[in-house]
Curated annotation (Swiss-Prot):
It comes from Rickettsia rickettsii (strain Sheila Smith). This is Putative Na(+)/H(+) antiporter NhaA homolog. GO terms for cellular component: plasma membrane. The keyword Transcription regulation does not apply. InterPro entries: Na/H_antiporter_dom_sf (IPR023171), NhaA (IPR004670). It is a multi-pass membrane protein. GO terms for biological process: regulation of pH.
Amino acid sequence: MNIKKLILPAAAALGGVVIPVLIYMFFNYGKPELIKGWAIPIATDTAFVLGILSFFSRHISLELRAFIIGFSLIDDAFALIILALFYAKTINTLALLISSIIIFILFILNYRQVKQLFYYIIVGLLLCISMVKSGIHDTLCRAIIALFIPVNIKGEFNTSFKKLENLIRPFVNYFILPLFVFMNSGILLEYFAFKGICSNSILALIYGIIFGLSVGKQLGIMLFSYPFVKFKLCNLPSDTSWLKFYSIAILRGIGFTLSLFIGSNV
């Protein structure tokens, strides 16, 4: 693994977590009932970012696409780990220990290059059960399983799967995702009565989330990425200017459904 290529997405993801949290806390400082929602603006909705980028696929190099996916994985991992560590109601130590053992088994399967999906499905189901019993949200479990499933499975199944993926991708990007947003936003319109929306608490919450995502994400990504590139600890993706990199940073502020998901678990 090329460590230099890992540094940039890791630094960008860290900045995309730290600065939004600080901005949210700035607006909600001194409000105990709202400050606990500090994790809401840290998450990026990767599916929507990739959907938007599909319109500009000709202008995105393979290296930049790899950076975006790498950033997304690390960013989502931060969000899920924070959710698991800070928002779990109760922790069952024994179940957590069993989960750790099962994760190690997944690692062994991947390390030994076991390509039969059947084993990953069985072990993954056991991991989901143990993780739910431990008190940690099962979303983290699915992310862990996906991390260990090999991507280089060869044969007829893989070829058919790729064809199906290419067939349904436009339908998912341009129809399913917008419909999903509309149907799952969880926003009650009566909350937008004039008196309610103008209360100090609601405004602080709204400002914290909106500025955390729209300003904090891009600011954090740029502030944490620039020094590493400047001191040659890593490089920008090929055929990528700082302006293009900044445009990607702006898109990382799309945190709709994942932010709602975290908010519902706060």
